[in-house]
Amino acid sequence: MEASVGQAGKTKFQIDLRRYLREDGEDEGLIHLICEIAEASKYIVNSIRTGDLGVAGTSNLYGEEQLALDVLSDRILRKRLAKSGVVSNIVSEETNDIVFVAPHRTGNYSVSYDPLDGSSLVDVNLAVGTIVSIYKGSDLMQPGNKQAAALYILYGPRTTLVYTTGNGVHEFGMNQLMEYTLLRRNIRMESKASIYAPGGLRSLYTDGTDKFVRQLETNGVKLRYSGGLVPDINQMLMKGKGIFFYPHLQNAPQGKLRLLFELNPMAFLMEQAGGAASNGHQRILDLVPQQFDERSPFFCGCREDVELAETLIREEKQIR
């Protein structure tokens, strides 16, 4: 499933994030950008531990009330990206507008991100995370298969950073000095799931998705769900044998999750680990976004289970 480096958190030789990226032959600009995001996460995790859990009094572009931690995390990450010297454009799930940093400068990257996914879980002390998608150049409206890198940072009992640049999926952990060191390299998914994490109200599932859940249960696949996208996807990757899905619903045919901010980066990570990600009809990474707030159904995990979901949803459409 994976190649670990000693025991997690007990590596014989501590390999830090920047060194690992350099040894992997990554572009210096991309290395700098990923490391800047890692630096920003140190301030975000400190804000989670000590910050204001009250409501900020504003709404994001989806009409969702913003928590103070959402606003603070967005500000931390945005400032770090804008001053990195390697970013052309920025768009956050929490704002209405794209931020043009240096759109005409060549060799730069553009970044879409969710600064604190699952922030409503903080006050009950559940894990939350930051999700980041990176593209070359200034165009953010590209299919996910054009991503230069994707990563998430999970703020749980431990703080971990999981990334891909198209050369496998690797996990780093924040140590006592708040530096990221290698825990696992080349994380791999198995072909079939033993756990599943569903989103949305099951009574609103369409027939195909409901059949899919019943088939999982018949196969002995166990329910393991935290209510947060980042910890649930992380569980699937680290266990290597699971599936997460937030499907189309009877009252929400496009589901809930956002293509640019959540689905593309998670799909890139999952595929790089040998899994699959689909909207029930086609590969997530082939979808061309038409707007920043575009949503899509999402089935992400072990390849055979994603294919089963596609088959049952296809049959549902044929019956109609």
Curated annotation (Swiss-Prot):
SUPFAM superfamilies: Carbohydrate phosphatase (SSF56655)
A single GO cellular-component term on record: cytosol
Enzyme Commission number(s): 3.1.3.11
Gene3D superfamilies in the record: 3.40.190.80, Fructose-1,6-Bisphosphatase, subunit A, domain 1
Pathway the protein acts in: Carbohydrate biosynthesis; gluconeogenesis
Keyword annotations of the record: Carbohydrate metabolism, Cytoplasm, Hydrolase, Magnesium, Metal-binding
Binding-site positions, Mg(2+) 2: 114, 117, 262
Membrane-spanning ranges: none
Keyword Oxidoreductase belongs to the record: no
GO process terms (BP): fructose 1,6-bisphosphate metabolic process; fructose 6-phosphate metabolic process; fructose metabolic process; gluconeogenesis; sucrose biosynthetic process
Record-linked CDD domains: FBPase
Subunit comment: Homotetramer.
Family as reported in the entry's similarity comment: Belongs to the FBPase class 1 family.
UniProt protein name: Fructose-1,6-bisphosphatase class 1
Taxonomic classification: Bacteria, Pseudomonadati, Thermodesulfobacteriota, Desulfuromonadia, Desulfuromonadales
